[in-house]
Design a protein with these regions (language model features):
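Amphipathic alpha-helical packing segments from all-alpha helical-bundle domains
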Residues: 82-122
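Extended low-complexity intrinsically disordered regions
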Residues: 77-81, 120-133
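Hydrophobic alpha-helical connector segments
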Residues: 61, 68-95
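Key DNA-contact positions within bacterial/archaeal DNA-binding proteins
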Residues: 46
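Tryptophan-centric aromatic hotspots in well-structured domains and transmembrane helices
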Residues: 51-53, 126-127
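Solvent-exposed, amphipathic alpha-helical segments
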Residues: 15, 19-27, 89-96, 124, ...
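Basic, helix-initiating cap at the start of DNA-binding domains
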Residues: 1-42, 53-57
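DNA major-groove recognition helix of helix-turn-helix
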Residues: 52, 62-63
Length: 133
């Protein structure tokens, strides 16, 4: 079966993610605009939507790319994550997850490496982070 449409540029993913990363660092999740990401990446907004279904999906992918998977003690790794440069983005995604099942699923997937069966280490750390924002 032939692929229709223009072929995807391999470097476009990185350009889009780099533009989104810059915006998240500049103003956090609320400042992330797909129109502006497209402008900065030199691509069409539709190209972003072909790769990521939503603003939340793009932000989650940036966090996934930029934040290493936890090693060692999960609570310490999660605390470092929430107090690091992406803590505010993750807190915003968690807020968005209250309104959207799709975002909730992405957040659960994003935080899965920090979950320990039978051990609620995330709750108190996350609660403190949300109170500080």
């Amino acid at each position: 079966m032939a692929i229709r449409g223009r072929p995807r540029r391999a470097e476009a993913d990185a350009e889009i993610l780099d533009a989104a990363l810059a915006m998240l660092r500049e103003g956090g999740y609320r400042a992330l605009s797909l129109d502006e990401v497209a402008r900065r990446a030199g691509t069409a907004k539709s190209s972003i939507y072909r790769r990521w279904a939503s603003k939340a999906a793009l932000a989650a992918e940036v966090v996934r790319r930029e934040v290493p998977a936890p090693e060692g003690e999960v609570a310490a790794a999660f605390e470092a994550l929430m107090n690091g440069p992406f803590g505010g983005v993750i807190a915003s995604l968690i807020g968005e997850a209250q309104e959207s099942a799709e975002t909730r699923s992405m957040v659960l997937d994003l935080l899965a490496p920090y979950r320990v069966a039978g051990d609620d280490v995330l709750g108190p750390i996350l609660f403190r982070r949300l109170l500080n924002d």
